[in-house]
Amino acid sequence: MDFETGEHQYQYKDILSVFEDAFVDNFDCKDVQDMPKSILSKEEIDHIIMSKDAVSGTLRLFWTLLSKQEEMVQKFVEEVLRINYKFLMSPIKTEQRQPSMMTRMYIEQRDRLYNDNQVFAKYNVSRLQPYLKLRQALLELRPAKNVLIDGVLGSGKTWVALDVCLSYKVQCKMDFKIFWLNLKNCNSPETVLEMLQKLLYQIDPNWTSRSDHSSNIKLRIHSIQAELRRLLKSKPYENCLLVLLNVQNAKAWNAFNLSCKILLTTRFKQVTDFLSAATTTHISLDHHSMTLTPDEVKSLLLKYLDCRPQDLPREVLTTNPRRLSIIAESIRDGLATWDNWKHVNCDKLTTIIESSLNVLEPAEYRKMFDRLSVFPPSAHIPTILLSLIWFDVIKSDVMVVVNKLHKYSLVEKQPKESTISIPSIYLELKVKLENEYALHRSIVDHYNIPKTFDSDDLIPPYLDQYFYSHIGHHLKNIEHPERMTLFRMVFLDFRFLEQKIRHDSTAWNASGSILNTLQQLKFYKPYICDNDPKYERLVNAILDFLPKIEENLICSKYTDLLRIALMAEDEAIFEEAHKQVQRFDDRVWFTNHGRFHQHRQIINLGDNEGRHAVYLHNDFCLIALASGQILLTDVSLEGEDTYLLRDESDSSDILRMAVFNQQKHLITLHCNGSVKLWSLWPDCPGRRHSGGSKQQLVNSVVKRFIGSYANLKIVAFYLNEDAGLPEANIQLHVAFINGDVSILNWDEQDQEFKLSHVPVLKTMQSGIRCFVQVLKRYYVVCTSNCTLTVWDLTNGSSNTLELHVFNVENDTPLALDVFDERSKTATVLLIFKYSVWRLNFLPGLSVSLQSEAVQLPEGSFITCGKRSTDGRYLLLGTSEGLIVYDLKISDPVLRSNVSEHIECVDIYELFDPVYKYIVLCGAKGKQVVHVHTLRSVSGSNSHQNREIAWVHSADEISVMTKACLEPNVYLRSLMDMTRERTQLLAVDSKERIHLIKPAISRISEWSTITPTHAASNCKINAISAFNDEQIFVGYVDGVIIDVIHDTALPQQFIEEPIDYLKQVSPNILVASAHSAQKTVIFQLEKIDPLQPNDQWPLMMDVSTKYASLQEGQYIILFSDHGVCHLDIANPSAFVKPKDSEEYIVGFDLKNSLLFLAYENNIIDVFRLIFSCNQLRYEQICEEEIAQKAKISYLVATDDGTMLAMGFENGTLELFAVENRKVQLIYSIEEVHEHCIRQLLFSPCKLLLISCAEQLCFWNVTHMRNNQLEREQKRRRSRRHKQHSVTQEDAVDAAPIAADIDVDVTFVADEFHPVNRGTAELWRNKRGNAIRPELLACVKFVGNEARQFFTDAHFSHFYAIDDEGVYYHLQLLELSRLQPPPDPVTLDIANQYEDLKNLRILDSPLMQDSDSEGADVVGNLVLEKNGGVARATPILEEASS
């Protein structure tokens, strides 16, 4: 008070909030970047400018200023605002000197609230989201309406209410009349009366009771309530607000429901549930968006602790404000430290929690609540388990107790899951249970683990999410012998491991994660192994195995981990898997004799694709997502620290990013022309940080100093971390769209970029794509039209390089990279879409240019590139995979991911003698980033001077021979098999032909043939292998080579790429070029000596997709527009019907029946009639199917009674051909996700195989026995049914019963002598309960395989996917090898049986020293014997 004038003196802090609306409308919060650092710190400025709107920014500015001394606020008003905001400064100064009546009323109310709540006044931290939501609700509140704040104990309900009621806008809305009552102890009529009287005294201090104190207390309550209602409806109080804190129950609420505006807080669900949404706005502080943010956690801790922000721990496992404040108090008072606070029992917190539990009456309820501590923290506890731990005290239904606990907010219910959870603050209560072992025992017994895991289904029945997440917590608390047995039974079971992985999610909520499974295996390893070395080896093998197969598992819903493990090359994994499959002798199992595993570890991105990736120190990875967010996550498989960085006001695509300043900061260039600076490691506590992130917009820095750049976009930047200048060691060079280049210096103290004093370089070059600084003196600039310019920064002169060898017309520059800088020399890598160049700076200011021989595959192009920090290797992402290019020897030394269109790469040097680099790789259309490792290769193991090899290759331990592919070569998915099935022919990326003998799986039995024509560098486009002596290949230049004789077949008709090549008989070869609509038919040997030979080869203008020889006389050609044929005896009589208007998209020819599918989904069936030396087609039926997707493949059974069609969307449908109709039997959706490339029936009609992104084996008998009703169009998936397949609506693969009304044509044709062996193998096989029709599913490593081959018995299957991985799957017949296994008992710790006769790979201990470790795309097979005996050849089939 001014004693001379008698007036109060007010500070700027008192009246600043009065001008909130004026600041929201007129003040640009980004201008705080120009404020003196003496007013706001760098961190405070970042916190303000990151706000997503003006309201949030203004509130954060005001809250920050109000936390400072008055002199700082005065400086802000009188110095900062004076520059650009004088129109704001003047009224603030006027109001400070002579405040209005409303301002004085506001200050009076605010001071009173602060005075009544001293702890709040000292330690409150404003919480933006709850503040905004509650303030808006109060501003919209009208009389007789309510606002409710609920939350668990300690969630900060009262302080949020106080903070919002201090708002000038709220005070005005309530006419500065807010009345407060704390109803914490209002549990009786006496306390109700007391609190009503207290409220009446607040409103009318002169009020005196006229009631007789001896009268009935209810009458007195009603009397005061009536008086309060009368007062609150009067004009002075019609807008007032009544705040009811800590409402305990509905009775207390009813007593104070006085028909005015009411704000109430409660932690009791009974109050929350009682108040209707029609009258009450509900705000829950338990919602994830309302909890404390990491910045708010930090601010709260700093209120209590006298320390620097960086001294706070990064990880504080709570956001409960009350718990946080008590932790901080304990540390401040020396009762705990940051290292041991989790283990210190705080008496103050215990007292608070205990007092909150006093509501539990009778005593049995407290006992039941205490027993909940038997469950692990944060678990979602199934309510069915509660009766097990309350069995001796519960006197009513479990849900009665749950509802009571929930009523007092002591548990939280998740009705959809039928589970409850315990609020985290109650976990601080240390409870000692007398019978803890018995409680754990009862939970373990509930799941009946021995019986459950002895089930005959591939998904163990009756297990819930709780079991997969927390069963180990209970197992470790039971007695030793059984504990060890059950741990092994559960955690070594591949079915359990698979379901656990599928149920888990990543820290950023991507579905499917191995992290928690790995962590639990490591944590429970002592219980599993129990000092047994054999189990130590097995657990270690599983820990190594799971990361390698994670991609296959999460990318296919129907791939079984047990099936993958049975095909693993690790000895311990295979033996354990083989032991487990003995239980399922009626299932389909394979051993693998090819190259199945590629061992690619991944980072699962969920629904996002990765656009850019950077590997950081300490096994962190930075990934720019397609959503515009940036993921920073621990990829060590040890931790799960994750930060999601985003700019909520701009989600534009990131074009480039780079880390600097010891990886503490990030620079990003966006498609909208902005460049942003990010702080990578939030020093605020808490992991999984996902809020808006601090950024500095570099464009704004330049804009504030050079107004002409206001609307210019930045198109490129260069970061120099070794500038060596006195004022800065880090410089950022930015190029604008108009060709100007500016330089910014890094301010280490303020942690931001500031414009340097170096004049702007005006290049006048538009379309700058990338540039680098060389020798600290020159710029090398490349524009979008590939113009190279060198600028001398000392004088601003330029020199356009006239390089005659620099032929990059119609190319696109991707990146420039400078390295090997010395005093006068340096090298710049120029990476373009189709080429890579090396620009060498030489002494005397001269340059030389050389092209790098990156050897791109035909038709592919470079998408991105990254050089290793040591300058040795250049990692190139291309449209066909990764290339590791050795800059020392100028040679591509390794290939990988050849099936992928690479979008981002990074290479990180490890400084390890063995493991040299980590490689990151993201691909188009993939929601994963691959993590590869490169190891060193030296001495006798090196291959053609190659010094590195992939660690992810399965063949690191394989025997290498001359037949092995080089590390930078891979198998193409172009293959054929001889009719006798004696040899498989495959083509590699060097156009060599590999002869693989399936009967002998050793690599040493592989051989290669390189036709002479390969010297022309032409690509093989088609291959045909009739027998071991008749092998032909067709090239893109139209040349057809006889591989065995290395001669070209004479023809000049086709010069275009040979797309189809098929030898239909020992003497007839058909070749076709689709693009040219040409077909050539060769007669390999003259059949009739009397027939003239001058008419061969036959040439015709038709595009042949498939050719077939019928009756030994007629060649039938299938084309896009029809079917034509010719008679070999009379080749000139070529019958070509009129072209169809619709394309033929599928066809087959079986049992003299011709099946054609058109693009309009019309199906035609014809019978072939051979008579009088003529071939005629008799139409049997024409049907339009209901499926609207495009047909991709059609196949019929050998007898023509059924056909299957695959569609481009992955759908598969089975049809019957009967009574001159094509009728739908079964439709399968959701299994294949890609276009189906091939289908094949087994001769006995028990099996159908489909090939796309995975190889699926289908039970035809099950589909036939559960076929659609005639009027039905679809059969819905039974994915969500968990019951046994023997139940009423599913008949499995048992033989069709005689009394079923089924046409005889659908009975499996298993009694034919040729088919009997196949029927024996596949009869009575079944799938699981989710997909009973699906017998097995093998996910390819690559994106797809286009074809596969099989032997006659359908026991061996061969494929090469587009990743170059060779598969040889052999059916494992358990019933033929040994009798059915005994039921699983508790004693499962038996020794492994000797399975050497079934091993997949040779032992690693016996490998040759020639193990080079080429990438799996360049690796071959290993020996593996046993299983089903080899079968006789299968007959040729014609289908498409």
Swiss-Prot record:
Post-translational modification note: May be AMPylated on Lys-251.
An annotated Gene Ontology molecular function: structural molecule activity
One GO cellular component, as annotated: apoptosome
Annotated stretches, region: beta-propellor 1 (8 WD repeats): 597-965
Keywords from the UniProt entry: Apoptosis, Repeat, WD repeat
Entries under SUPFAM superfamilies matching the protein: P-loop containing nucleoside triphosphate hydrolases, WD40 repeat-like
Coiled-coil region(s): none
Gene inactivation effect: Pupal lethal. Reduced apoptosis during neuronal development results in central nervous system hyperplasia; a larger number of differentiated neurons survive in late stage embryos and third instar larvae have larger brains. Delayed removal of the larval salivary gland due to defects in induction of apoptosis. Imaginal discs of the eye and wing are enlarged. RNAi-mediated knockdown significantly reduces levels of apoptosis and caspase activity during embryonic development.
UniProt key word Repeat: yes
NB-ARC domain span: 133-301
Pfam families with a match to the protein in the record: APAF1_C (PF17908), Dark_CARD (PF22080), Dark_WHD (PF22164), NB-ARC (PF00931)
Upregulation: Induced by ionizing radiation including X-ray and UV.
Disulfide cysteine pairs (residue numbers): none
Segments forming domain CARD: 14-92
Residue segments, region beta-propellor 2 (7 WD repeats): 966-1373
Biological process annotations from GO: apoptotic process; autophagic cell death; central nervous system formation; chaeta development; compound eye retinal cell programmed cell death; dendrite morphogenesis; melanization defense response; negative regulation of humoral immune response
Region feature (Disordered): 1269-1289
UniProt remark on domains: Possesses an N-terminal caspase activation and recruitment domain (CARD). At high protein concentrations in vitro the CARD domain mediates the interaction of two octomeric apoptosome rings to form a double ring structure. Possesses a NB-ARC domain (nucleotide-binding adapter shared by APAF-1, certain R gene products and CED-4) that forms the inner hub of the apoptosome ring and is the main mediator of oligomerization. The interface of the NB-ARC domain and a neighboring helical region forms a binding pocket that can accommodate a nucleotide tri-phosphate with specificity for dATP. In its monomeric non-activated state the binding pocket may be associated with ADP.
Job of this protein: Main component of the apoptosome, an adapter protein complex that mediates activation of the caspase cascade in programmed cell death initiated by the intrinsic apoptosis pathway. Recruits the initiator caspase Dronc, promoting its autocatalytic cleavage and activation; triggers the caspase cascade upstream of the effector caspases Drice and dcp-1. Effector of reaper, grim and hid induced cell killing. Produces at least two isoforms that may activate distinct caspases by separate pathways.
Oligomeric and partner information: Exists as an auto-inhibited monomer; this state is maintained by intramolecular interactions between the NB-ARC and WD repeat domains. In vitro, at high protein concentrations or in the presence of non-physiologically high dATP concentrations, assembles into homooctomeric rings 300A in diameter to form the apoptosome complex; two rings can interact face to face (via CARD domains with some involvement of the WD repeat beta-propellors) to form a double ring structure. The octomeric ring may represent a non-functional or off-pathway conformation.
Name the record gives this protein: Apoptosome protein Dark
Gene: Dark
